[in-house]
Design a protein with these regions (language model features):
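Glycine- and acidic-residue-biased ligand/ion/polar-headgroup-sensing regions
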Residues: 64-83, 93
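A short, N-terminal "cap"/entry segment at the start of jelly-roll beta-barrel domains
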Residues: 2-50, 80, 96, 128-132
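Ligand-binding loop in jelly-roll beta-barrel domains
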Residues: 100-124
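A short beta-loop-beta micro-motif enriched in histidine and acidic residues
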Residues: 42-45, 56-71
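Short acidic-glycine-tyrosine-enriched beta hairpin
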Residues: 52-54, 83-100
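Histidine-centered metal-chelating micro-motifs
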Residues: 58-60, 78, 95-106
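Short histidine-centered beta-strand/loop micro-motifs
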Residues: 59-64, 81, 88, 106-108
Length: 132
């Protein structure tokens, strides 16, 4: 799991593997807490990470095998969940994406964004799955 980038997603997303359809030099993921067992829930892991996203870069449509919780620390992004409207998430605001929901985020601003994302994921599944 540690080898896949996410995104925050969201941005999410949320290291050491391919990014969300963007060159790794553009979208940076820093793992703060790698996949760690959740006490009393043997099939789940917790992951904490930050994402840095320059202007004009997005995550593309994707899913996660678990819930995503995030807070935008710097900048703002547009985000939407499958079937929903685009929404703006600004610095200081938090967001939630349920497990397996197709979603995407893009930085349409003029400054880089930074987000902190926490995930409770299914153990042994990729953290980020692109969707066409």
């Amino acid at each position: 799991m540690r080898g896949l980038l996410v995104a925050i997603a969201a941005f999410v997303c949320f290291g050491t593997a391919p990014s969300h359809a963007q060159p790794a030099s553009q979208f940076k993921v820093t793992i703060l807490i790698p996949a760690t067992p959740v006490t009393g829930v043997p099939d789940k892991v917790f992951v904490l990470l930050t994402t840095d996203c320059p202007p004009g870069v997005g995550t593309g449509r994707h899913t996660h095998p678990g819930d995503e919780y995030g807070t935008m620390m710097e900048g703002s992004v547009l985000t939407r969940q499958e079937g929903g409207e685009w929404k703006t998430v600004n610095a200081g605001q938090s967001y939630y994406v349920p497990a397996n929901i197709i979603h995407e985020t893009k930085n349409v601003g003029t400054v880089a964004t930074k987000a902190v994302n926490a995930f409770v994921l299914e153990k042994d599944k990729p953290r980020f799955t692109p969707v066409q």
